[in-house]
Amino acid sequence: MTTRGQLFFGAGLVVAAAGLVLGLHDLTKIGVLLILLPWLTLLLTRRDLDLEVSRSVEPERVPMNAHADVTVRVRNTGRLSTPVVRGEETLAPALGDRPHLLIPRLEGGESRQLTYRVRSHGRGRHPIGPLTLRVADPFGLATRVVAVPGQSSLVVLPRVLPLAAVRGVAAGGGGDSAASSRVALHGEDDAAVREYRIGDDLRRVHWRSTARTGQTMVRQDEQPTRRRALVLLDDREVAHAGTGDAGSFEWSVTAAASVVTLLLGERFDVHLSPASRESGVLLPVESLDHALDELAAVSLHPTSSLQGLVEALEEFTRHGGGLVIGVFGELEEQIADLCTARSRRGLALVIDREAFTVGGRDRGGAEDTVNRLTTGGWRAEVVRPGSSLPQVWAHLSLGLGVTR
């Protein structure tokens, strides 16, 4: 019941009481009507609305700060007509303000389409929906809020910056034999495996990898020797500071997306491994869309361990190795393991967390990490607020055979 309905009810009590005291029956009837009217309208708004809501998003994947059109289709699945109702779409904050929709009266079986536009302000897989309806009577005495189930999503891809192209890296990481470079990360007895797709020949199922991953894996046809690369992303919450686009984590995701895009364009076989990923079999990046979708959904995790990254690097090195690029926070006890497991070509972008912290004091942790990584055979650079990824990459990759 709205405030207006409560006022009607209160006024009805006063008028009815006055009518009884004064012996004015007509006044008493008016008071009773004022008392009953809010309750009658409340009952009317409690009637179920047989509405079905579906929506489509075009396009379903957009870059940062791009627009997407959302079409909402509302259908009356009942036999009775529905009243005019106001609706509000539930949106993630990164997609802007919630749009308000006016849904007209719908006869039984009738449907209407309504369209609105959203703009992507932040990376991620953002839900759209459900639709919240506000059902009210014509007098505004009662109202009811109903959420109609059903959701869609919009994938906002990370930024990708152009980087200098990699040249002169041999298959398998420079100097490795063609045979070893073809060894898959899933085991030395198979050329390569991937997840099962509908239509694959069941005779190609690789049972050992299936048992290890818990998912059906099949052998791929042997591919020509290609250069291989592993991109490591430190997604530990303790490794980053700042929020939004100005935060260190978004800088790291942009770096990972840009590096993966570069490597795939240079026809590398790329593997991507965040710190939060469970250790075990490393799955290859099947396409650029696959990599960007994964990086769009990545988020900070409360884990404080880099064991997942260390195991990924050890697995990669054990089965042929190749070019390794890491986007790390400050590293401490994990350094020894990481350097021991290193590939012959390791590049590291090290986030200076204190520099991204408002009022933070420089403890030299990032510099210490760079020094220890360099001692272990890596090339490493410190990343601070305002660091240009293309410039950092160009400086970091000097001597690796990079053309600009």
Predicted feature residues:
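Exposed, interaction-prone extracellular/peripheral surfaces
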Residues: F8, P149, A165-R167, I198-R404
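An amphipathic, basic-hydrophobic helix/alpha-beta surface used to engage anionic
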Residues: D26-L27, L36-L283, L323
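A eukaryote-biased signal for short, well-structured alpha-helical docking elements
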Residues: M1-D48
